């Protein structure tokens, strides 16, 4: 791939993600009342469902943690990651290394451990969040 084309594509997607995609989610997904993330919206931003699918909770945790780790040390992204992690640990874990599939908005289990995708996305999110806590003391000491 041509270097100039690659740079233009990176610039385009970075701008789109940081100026369009993330502001859409930042304004809507943090559930300040019950914890975790509200993730079911239509393209106009209207909530279509308030169920909390654990795979999406894990994915959102991953995105906020990844943005903090790789793009910018934005305090809001770190707070949003910790916010989702707290909800997941409190309500999403089913035991024996498994995660529930879907909860109601308050965190009550609607469907238990039916999907390995829930397990995967939560582990991916937790792993990325853990990199923050492993590297932060080192960064502060530098």
Question: What are these model-predicted stretches?
Answer:
Residues 132-142:
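Single conserved hydrophobic/aromatic residue that forms the stacking wall/gate
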Residues 2, 52-68, 78, 114-130:
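Well-ordered alpha-helical segments within folded domains of soluble proteins
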Residues 1-54, 75-83, 87-99:
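Low-complexity, Ser/Thr/Pro/Gly-enriched N-terminal "stalk/linker" regions
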Residues 82, 86-126:
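Well-ordered mid-protein domain cores that form the structural environment of catalytic cofactors
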């Amino acid at each position: 791939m041509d270097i100039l084309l690659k740079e233009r594509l990176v610039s385009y997607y970075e701008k789109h993600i940081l100026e369009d995609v993330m502001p859409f989610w930042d304004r809507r997904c943090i559930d300040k009342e019950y914890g975790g993330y509200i993730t079911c919206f239509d393209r106009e931003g209207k909530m279509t469902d308030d169920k909390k699918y654990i795979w999406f909770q894990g994915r959102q945790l991953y995105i906020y943690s990844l943005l903090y780790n790789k793009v910018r040390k934005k305090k809001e992204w770190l707070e949003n990651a910790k916010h989702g992690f707290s909800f997941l640990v409190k309500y999403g874990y089913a035991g024996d290394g498994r995660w529930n599939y879907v909860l109601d908005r308050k965190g009550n289990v609607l469907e238990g451990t039916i999907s390995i995708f829930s397990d995967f996305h939560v582990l991916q999110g937790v792993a990325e969040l853990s990199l923050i806590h492993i590297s932060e003391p080192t960064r502060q000491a530098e």
